[in-house]
């Protein structure tokens, strides 16, 4: 319900809201019972930060073996530190490198409780909420995207509720391992 409510106040997104409502009407005309459900807005806002925290930490941990000695690309560097640095930097995009840096920070001993373990708690809260939905309903129908694709030079406030919820709610499936399908 909250995901659709955020969309409905924005004139630019009226077409998406109307298309989504048409899909709901079509489902109902096919005999499906459709009910709006609510999720705590704070949990919806926490999806993206929790997802980024956990995924960056896991990416860093899962790729820690890329030393250039046994795994990873081998280089002709002269010492082990240079070999490891080369194996962990060459061949990765800037985005992947940023994720590794963020993941390393998250996994540092002094940050694990505050960042990683709290993100895992948030993930459990979200999946617990979803599991409660699935005790009562067979599935959830959500908009697949918040808006049409933005222009390359469009500014986007990545800390706004709209961004944190509308562009990232599909990560819920990753948290709980729920099957999903996106239908155009």
Task: Pin down the residues of each PLM region.
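Short beta-strand segments enriched in small/hydrophobic residues
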Residues: 1-9
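Glycine- and acidic-residue-enriched helix-capping/strand-helix junction motifs
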Residues: 8-18
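Glycine-rich, small-residue loops and helix-cap segments
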Residues: 16-37, 46, 55-61, 65, ...
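Conserved phosphate-binding/catalytic loops in two-lobed NTP-binding clefts
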Residues: 40
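N-terminal beta-loop-helix "entrance" segment that forms/cooperates
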Residues: 44-50
């Amino acid at each position: 319900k909250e995901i659709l409510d955020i969309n409905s106040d924005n004139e630019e997104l009226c077409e998406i809201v109307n298309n989504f409502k048409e899909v709901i009407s079509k489902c109902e005309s096919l005999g499906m019972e459709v009910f709006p459900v609510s999720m705590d807005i704070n949990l919806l806002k926490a999806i993206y930060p929790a997802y980024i925290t956990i995924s960056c930490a896991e990416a860093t941990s899962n790729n820690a073996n890329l030393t250039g000695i046994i795994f990873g690309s081998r280089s002709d560097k002269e010492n082990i530190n240079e070999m490891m640095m080369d194996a962990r930097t060459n061949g990765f995009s800037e985005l992947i490198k940023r994720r590794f840096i963020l993941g390393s920070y998250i996994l540092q001993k002094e940050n694990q409780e505050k960042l990683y373990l709290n993100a895992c708690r948030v993930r459990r809260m979200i999946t617990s909420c979803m599991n409660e939905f699935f005790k009562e309903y067979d599935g959830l129908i959500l908009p697949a995207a918040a808006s049409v694709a933005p222009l390359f030079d469009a500014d986007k406030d990545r800390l706004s509720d709209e961004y944190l919820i509308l562009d990232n709610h599909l990560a819920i499936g990753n948290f709980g391992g729920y099957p999903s399908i996106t239908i155009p």
